[in-house]
């Protein structure tokens, strides 16, 4: 006859007679049927097999299709243009590589496709070159203003031959890059995918139901300027009803749908139903939209300025290569382009046929879908309302189960309280362990030791926290006096998940699906045991039956956990290399390890109470951890950076060879110097750079008495909050920078009007990237200016306002602007006698023949040589560097 825990009353009574007494429970625990070492080996092997299977599926790519058939997308065809674009090298907006060479390649391909459309005779194709100018305000990393002049957009529209349908789908990519990167994944590959999709549609012998607009934009890396120019100024913008934005923040791998909306849930549903290789998660959307990721895409521009709903899709694997010299075509593995192209083509075809494309956009509609893929095999999606219902049902079913057991005297509320105390103490022990590990890492100068090898996070943080949690629960198990202790501990697991699920649902977090998946099957553990007994599979409930049933119930949990962990570690570890100097990344990776470790302990803690003593296993784990620490501090395993041809894991730096001139209120030159302005993009900072004559006598800039938030430094963009001036280096060098276009800043007029002061300025010279620091002085505040209709309340009042000015195809002869200041005291002092405003104008030569000086060329050569031979001297691993560089000038004047 079956002995079991919980369930129908007649079986529960038999279970109680055999198992309810604490002394019987303790004897069972120490007996031959209790869980032993080999069962924990089974458990670890199961988790390892699940993780390996998940990773294998995560890396699986479809076969590359032959390029001779135009019925389907072909990576083989797409790579031809990709190789051509990346062979040009870096392509910043305004460079010859972009404005002439890459532009010519794209135009040439469009011309050939136009001939195909004319030959087939079913559809029509139009193309246009747009060169917009404009300004807008942006809150990203900081608050700043962007102005652009004649940047380049190449726009193509294909649709039914009878004429524009009035309803268009927009596909967007950008073919410009950051300086010093060939930009294969960011974002040339997206443009080649779009080009092949266009070619497939061009060969179609079936008339398209609606139009598709392809935007090849040439100034995304200037903070989304080209998308802004298109959606605000191009005549085709009025017919666009939805968009797909293609991006890249890594190199290859599977592209993920990480943003959808706002509103227009049919658009998301179309992707979920039609993409043959889905990879998506509402959890990724909520993380990205929270702002913790230092990145942004054109999705924001189309959403905020065009009020259009869309899909944001990006490559994220190998983020170490993002915005570096290593973002190369050959690093994108075969099949990665094929799967993205097949997904995009299938979704485009489905959207064009959708009747919803013709309906007015429900833009203000909230997200209505919970969606995620299951290891890339299929997608699960349901409405938010259905999700809330499922979540609350799962919560109340759990609460009902616990109440039922309390009423049937299987355990008491006091027993639950004691079990929760076990969880709290275990969690506190893990938190303390995490903090001790972080302190050890900082003290031993091991910060970011996991950067080149993400697996170290598991050994450094997860393992010791697992040991801490196991010690606590093992101690309580050895001193247990609760009857049915395993049941009590297990039910507190369910209560914990149910409570978390309830709170996430209450606060409208769609990512609550993840907790729901961890709760559904474990709730049915006892029912499964009852069914096994009913069909004669088991005769009685033993610790081993409980173990294997729980292992089965938690298999989906392990799959989802392994999937989430592999994605989070793969994504977040490389991001730490560009997160800046303000946040110690150990306080990000440590809590990430805590989530993994505490989740694992929570899943299995009840098994400690039906196991033999855990002392041997704990000692073994501690010995493994001690051996790991020894290896970490005595070998190169603990070095955060390492160069290899296949997998470079390098420190990012920006090095600008700059001339700086400073003038006082009277117009007298007070300071003129030449230096390397260097900042490291990760937390180890510029002070961690290797010792060399280039850096001898260097120190952080002296910002004493400087009002400018940017410390009168030639920042490329407004990133001083992530990379503060005091964390950078100002390295004096003897050689001045030869400047082909020196900056000439002049005051044109100055008019006082009561408490207001209007100043008009002109800037001549400078290159295609220019930064303006506007710092009001002597109780003045910025009221307005000619760049934008700035809303100070929305924008945020600042000590220094930053304007990033660029040009693309053509340079402006002069930049003329006015600034209106308001005095806080109500009466403006005599502007002729008092300082009113400080302007700093910096320009950057980030491409072409003017980019490098001899000093920068020597620095590049030294980095390239020494990062390949770190074994030649102690500490040479610090030469594991990848560099963005250029010449620069900054002129500071007080008016």
Swiss-Prot record:
The keyword Glycoprotein applies. Its EC number is 3.4.-.-. The record marks 322 as: Transition state stabilizer. Residues 1-34, 405-423, 474-492, 539-544, 608-613 are cytoplasmic. The chain crosses the membrane at residues 35-55, 384-404, 424-444, 453-473, 493-513, 518-538, 545-565, 587-607, 614-634. It is found in: Endoplasmic reticulum membrane. Zn(2+) 1 binds at residues 174, 186, 247. One of its GO terms (cellular component) is endoplasmic reticulum membrane. Residues 56-383, 445-452, 514-517, 566-586, 635-895 are lumenal. InterPro entries: ERMP1-like_C, ERMP1_1-A_TM, Fxna-like_M28_dom, M28_fam, Peptidase_M28. Glycans are attached at residues 659, 702, 758. Binds 2 Zn(2+) ions per subunit. It is an enzyme of class 3 (hydrolase). The keyword S-adenosyl-L-methionine does not apply. GO terms for biological process: proteolysis. One of its GO terms (molecular function) is metalloexopeptidase activity. Residues 10-30 have a biased composition (Basic and acidic residues). It is a multi-pass membrane protein. The active site is at residue 220. Its cofactor is Zn(2+). Zn(2+) 2 binds at residues 186, 221, 323. Its main location: endoplasmic reticulum. Residues 1-30 are annotated as: Disordered. It holds the Pfam family Peptidase_M28. Belongs to the peptidase M28 family. This is Putative endoplasmic reticulum metallopeptidase 1-A.
């Amino acid at each position: 006859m079956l002995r079991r825990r919980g369930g129908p009353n007649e079986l529960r009574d038999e279970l109680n007679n055999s198992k309810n007494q604490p002394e019987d429970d303790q004897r069972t625990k120490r007996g031959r049927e209790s869980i032993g070492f080999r069962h924990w080996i089974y458990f670890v092997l199961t988790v390892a097999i699940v993780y390996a299977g998940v990773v294998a599926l995560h890396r699986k790519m479809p076969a590359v299709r032959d390029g001779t058939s135009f019925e389907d997308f072909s990576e083989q065809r797409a790579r031809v243009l990709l190789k051509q674009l990346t062979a040009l090298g870096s392509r910043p907006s305004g460079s010859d590589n972009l404005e002439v060479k890459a532009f010519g390649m794209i135009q040439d391909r469009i011309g050939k496709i136009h001939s195909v459309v004319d030959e087939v005779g079913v559809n029509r194709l139009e193309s246009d070159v747009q060169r917009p100018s404009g300004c807008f305000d942006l809150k990203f990393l900081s608050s700043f203003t962007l102005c652009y002049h004649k940047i380049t957009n190449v726009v193509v529209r294909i649709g039914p031959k009878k004429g524009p349908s009035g309803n268009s789908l927009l596909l967007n990519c950008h073919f410009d890059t950051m300086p010093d990167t060939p930009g294969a994944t960011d974002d040339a590959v997206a443009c080649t995918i779009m080009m092949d999709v266009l070619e497939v549609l061009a060969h179609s012998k079936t008339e398209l139901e609606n139009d598709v607009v392809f935007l090849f934009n040439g100034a995304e890396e200037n903070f989304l300027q080209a998308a802004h120019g298109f959606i605000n100024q191009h005549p085709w913008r009025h017919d666009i009803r939805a968009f797909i934005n293609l991006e890249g923040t890594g190199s290859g791998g599977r592209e993920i749908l990480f943003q959808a909306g706002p509103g227009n849930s049919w658009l998301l549903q179309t992707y979920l139903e039609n993409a043959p290789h889905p990879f998506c998660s509402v959890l990724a959307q909520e993380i990205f939209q929270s702002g913790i990721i230092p990145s942004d895409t054109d999705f924001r521009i189309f959403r905020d300025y065009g009020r259009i709903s869309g899909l944001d899709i990006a490559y994220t694997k190998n983020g170490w290569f993002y915005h570096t010299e290593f973002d190369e075509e050959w690093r994108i593995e075969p099949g990665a382009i094929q799967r993205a192209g097949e997904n995009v083509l299938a979704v485009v075809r489905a959207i064009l046929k959708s009747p919803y494309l013709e309906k007015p956009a429900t833009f203000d509609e909230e997200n209505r879908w919970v969606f995620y893929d299951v290891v890339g095999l299929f997608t699960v999606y349901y409405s938010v309302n259905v999700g809330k219902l499922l979540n609350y049902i799962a919560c109340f079913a759990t609460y009902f189960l616990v109440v039922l057991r309390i009423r049937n005297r299987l355990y008491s509320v006091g027993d639950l309280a004691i079990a929760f105390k076990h969880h709290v103490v275990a969690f506190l022990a893990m938190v303390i362990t995490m903090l001790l590990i972080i302190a050890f890492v900082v003290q031993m100068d091991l910060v970011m030791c996991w950067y080149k090898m993400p697996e170290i996070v598991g050994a450094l943080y997860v393992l010791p926290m697992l040991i801490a949690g196991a010690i606590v629960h093992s101690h309580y198990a050895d001193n247990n006096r609760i009857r049915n202790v395993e049941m009590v501990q297990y039910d507190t697991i369910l209560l914990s998940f149910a409570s978390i699920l309830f709170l996430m649902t209450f606060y409208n977090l769609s990512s609550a699906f993840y907790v729901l998946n961890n709760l559904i099957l474990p709730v049915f553990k006892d029912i499964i045991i009852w069914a096994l007994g009913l069909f004669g599979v088991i005769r009685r409930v033993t610790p081993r039956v409980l173990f294997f049933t729980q292992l089965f119930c938690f298999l989906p949990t392990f799959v989802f956990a392994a999937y989430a962990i592999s994605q989070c570690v793969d994504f977040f570890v490389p991001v730490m290399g560009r997160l800046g100097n303000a946040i110690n990344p150990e306080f990000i990776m440590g809590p990430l390890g805590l989530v993994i470790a505490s989740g694992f302990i929570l899943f299995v803690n009840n098994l400690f109470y039906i196991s033999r003593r855990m002392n041997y296993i704990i000692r073994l784990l501690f010995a493994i951890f001690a051996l790991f620490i020894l290896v970490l501090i005595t070998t190169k395993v603990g070095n955060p950076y390492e160069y290899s041809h296949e997998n470079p894991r390098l420190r990012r730096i920006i090095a600008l060879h700059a001339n700086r001139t400073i003038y006082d209120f009277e117009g007298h030159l007070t300071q003129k110097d030449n230096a390397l302005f260097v900042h490291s993009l990760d937390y180890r900072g510029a002070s961690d750079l290797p010792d060399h004559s280039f850096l001898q006598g260097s120190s952080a800039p002296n910002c004493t008495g400087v009002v400018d938030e940017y410390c009168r430094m030639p920042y490329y963009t407004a990133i001083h909050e992530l990379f503060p001036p005091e964390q950078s280096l100002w390295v004096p060098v003897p050689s001045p920078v030869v400047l082909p276009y020196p900056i000439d800043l002049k005051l044109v007029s100055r008019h006082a009007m009561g408490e207001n002061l209007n100043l008009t300025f002109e800037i001549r010279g400078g290159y295609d990237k220019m930064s303006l620091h506007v710092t009001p002085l002597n109780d003045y505040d910025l009221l307005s200016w000619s760049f934008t209709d700035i809303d100070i309340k929305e924008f945020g009042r600042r000590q220094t306002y930053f304007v990033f000015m660029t040009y693309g195809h053509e340079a402006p002869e002069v930049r003329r602007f006015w600034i209106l200041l308001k005095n806080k005291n109500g009466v403006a002092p005599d502007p002729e006698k008092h300082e009113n405003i400080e302007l700093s104008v910096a320009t950057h030569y980030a491409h072409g023949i003017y980019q490098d000086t001899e000093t920068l060329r020597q620095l590049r050569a030294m980095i390239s040589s020494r990062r390949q031979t770190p074994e030649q001297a102690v500490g040479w691993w610090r030469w594991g560097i990848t560099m963005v560089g250029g010449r620069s000038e900054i002129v500071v004047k007080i008016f």
